[in-house]
């Protein structure tokens, strides 16, 4: 640095300064705002370090407080409308709410973007429900500080999260100079903030410290994985030269810029320039003329060079730094910003951070633009899921991530974060306290707590186990199942009352239909648990209906397009859900819509009827009569019953393709060979038919020698012994056969036969039981004993069925079955001790001394058995089944509530009538019973006889009572009713309410319910039909009292298998036992690679999961589709028309292009790559060449010499991003430097050759990107001018060598010095470069005691290996040995007197020698 240059002020002062806030609100006036006062722009790095040091000092975790985005707002010189500013503010709100955002603006009140930023902070920050890292940084000069002596600038409101960054200005600087300097400083602030200083330079306290001790904290070192850098983005709406300077700074530093093209005329010109640059007949000179003419009316005619540089910088690579949007796209500003960050920063190795930003801003469009699978590791996926799951408005991004099927693994931290961002009242009050009995909120999900959650979920789902596996939370990698993780996340979200997330995760589960039904059952149970909080109950019931409806819709969608696939799902066992099939799980979860579906009803009927089919003969007998007669007489089974033909038998044949792939399997014993096909069944059949005939009649052509050389078909065996087994090697053809009668085991094991046989015996049982009851007197003890035994067998059968079903279905789902067994048992006990074997002592204790009580119990038993028979057997009828359900619904919903209401009226009326009508009657149990009896019977009759005055009462009339408390009713007989007016009114009131109000209300309720429950009754009836089929599947083949024979035969079958089929449980005709262990494909043309693991039903589950994803996607997009088809078609036509106009223009101008516009190619040295031949006109970077896209080439590192390979920049796909990031970091470090030698970078982040375009991108044959230095050494010897000589090589050139290392010691110079006789110590001393390696000008002199080499020049040189991103640079160093002893004769080198150097060496080298002599005083 020259001594005459002023030393920049590097001071930094944190302070609180007063500012003048202008506005109409209450914030107008003087405000005190925290500020950082910079002495000069060169003090900016210190300010950045101060900011991040303060953040690190107050942080409780790594990178806390570091923003995700830094948005610079540029609108200097513009004026926006209130509506436009409101649109921009709404676009910025998504950033402030979704992620950590720092806004940078000028802060001036006449800057519209500054007002937008201030308004956004005031409207968003007070309403946030989570901690937000939001900061508004105002960068300006010290004119913003309020002062009495100068006119201070008015600033925007600084009351919320605002920091001033003030730079002192020079007193003599003009306004334009200060404005340009502040514009560059504002842009440099964003660039430097986007590159935080290394953690080694930031002090972080080990414990909480006061603000006064922040600066004394110790330093820490973080690993590169913890290096978080915010993404800088600029939003431009400027209309001045200063705004263009700031915009150019951003583009030159590779920061994406979003220009609001309709905000001002300058932005419109920029948009037009961008469009013109894409035209086919672009001409640079015409463009400059057009641009100047457009800028002149705006007073910006001298700014065309800035726009030209802007366009060159933004188009110097394959990255688009500038994006134009209009006001209609401001609502999607977050998506635009994320897309720009993806294109600009993903190439620098920051894809993970871009993906996390997209998750925070709910912008799933980036997922289709990058290889997410390569970036989604467990840590990043956990962070993304936490961002998405904790917010209901980010379901779109969550569904987009789940569509990629990432390897999800649930962690305790993830679930705890979800809990803290959810409705903690529901979770703590209902789930933890009420359901689990916890009195505290857990801080982690340990196995014990996870086990308690599993028990709760099992209880809520009525027995479905392993839905919340505690083993998932261990560190064992074997439990990392993504489908299990999705199930756990869905259940946890349900427990946190997050309905939207539950529906999304259910749609992406492995078995969406089954899992949705289970979640629906859990939601319904949670709704029941939260009955006291009606809003929770309503929300959970709605969620339950939505999940059940989603499962039904998905199932119906598949059934309408592919009924076979839907039916196959019903026959497929599900290992994660108790091994149930779909229908069983639907019954378990009370999913009536699924069971009522047509496909499920087909499955239920197949389960009920099996393969049994009744003949049409005789016609006059209905089917049920044929089944009953056949079941009783057995012989008609052979004549009236048939076995329904099975589906076409799928033989376990293997296709030739699979046989080709299955190398480990032996070929068939017989083969068919044909010259026309591999398998010729026709030739094989002809051979089988003609061979015996030709042998018998002597027409064997083979014996006569007339056979063809290539026979059309022949069959030969590999094993002669197996010829007689099957002469046709390719299987037998199916033949049409008559249906045969079923076997007795098939007939009696069919549920429909069990049903009709059981109903027949049940009717006989009821008749016999009724006969035993109506026998006079004590009846027949023998008959009663027989009927009790028969009843006991019925009870045993019911217990057996209930026990069998209770193995998988909890008893709480079968309350009627449990009640039936219990009531039956009570009646059996009472009849046993009262009638069959009377236990006299017990009866005497109970006060029962007559057989009448036994007859009463028997009568009620007959009633109960009759009604239970009605409800048990009636669901099979399609007429009476729905009717009984309707009656049941009316009774439960209307009549029960009516009874509660009328009971209140009856009891209150009974009290009032007793008090007013019979005031003197004593209150006894007999009186109470008679009063209630009259009140109850008044529902059906109107008996007023006991309320009228009888003759007896008239005779006992006393008149007015003499004493107040005696004979209040004026009758001597207390049982006489009072005839007063109040008594009349009380009675009339009761009958009016009872007869005129309550009965019509009940009828109205019945009428309304009967109309509304048709669909529900039909579903319930179909639901009961499945239960009926399941019950009779489990019943023994013969009903009571023949059940004992079934038990005896079952015991015999344990020793003999002769009748095993007769007593086997009939499960389902379409569900075979081998289906439980085989894979889902049933075709012999699919080869399964044995080395690849497959899960059972993997492909079927994948099919349903994809359909569920599509259904979820379509459901979410229905509300977003606003444009109709005609508008879309019109836009499509306009797009095609514009494209045709562009192509026509390009076609018409294709023949008029100049030769200079055409691209020619030439071979790049030492390679087979062709590079573009660039003419001299297009070579400078200042000239716009829109279609310039050179090939990218980097010489492989292996092709370099071994000593150079360690310096080569590896430009692989994995490493090129890191190279770009390093170059951007170098550029950011030089933002405040005044050195004009700073390299320019392309939009992609590679350095640009100062010589201009070369026609080749990459580093080419150079080992490094950027400058590849070749050092030239001017070694002088001699202390005076007459003896001065210089060292040259054999080619009479100054010694030179490529210098690729960056150390301060020059090893090649050391070897040269040693070669000419300098000692080792002196050679090392002369080779050590200065710390300040600036170029020494000719007017300076080096002292004689200075031994460091002098840096004479550093110049860019032309080289055939140069590319756009790598070039040659000559670095010249000089050293004077003066009077040191040297060797005069050196191999490869020689000493040349400086007086004879002209004409001997190259002129530019001679100039360097004389320059070296000058600075050394020679």
Swiss-Prot record:
It comes from the Eukaryota. It is found in: Membrane. GO terms for molecular function: monoatomic cation channel activity. The chain crosses the membrane at residues 617-637, 755-775, 782-802, 818-838, 856-876, 898-918, 986-1006. GO terms for cellular component: plasma membrane. Its main location: membrane. One of its GO terms (biological process) is metal ion transport. The keyword Transmembrane helix applies. The keyword Metal-binding does not apply. It is a multi-pass membrane protein. Keywords: Apoptosis, Membrane, Transmembrane, Transmembrane helix. InterPro entries: TRPM. Plays a major role in programmed cell death. This is Protein ced-11. The lineage of its organism: Eukaryota, Metazoa, Ecdysozoa, Nematoda, Chromadorea.
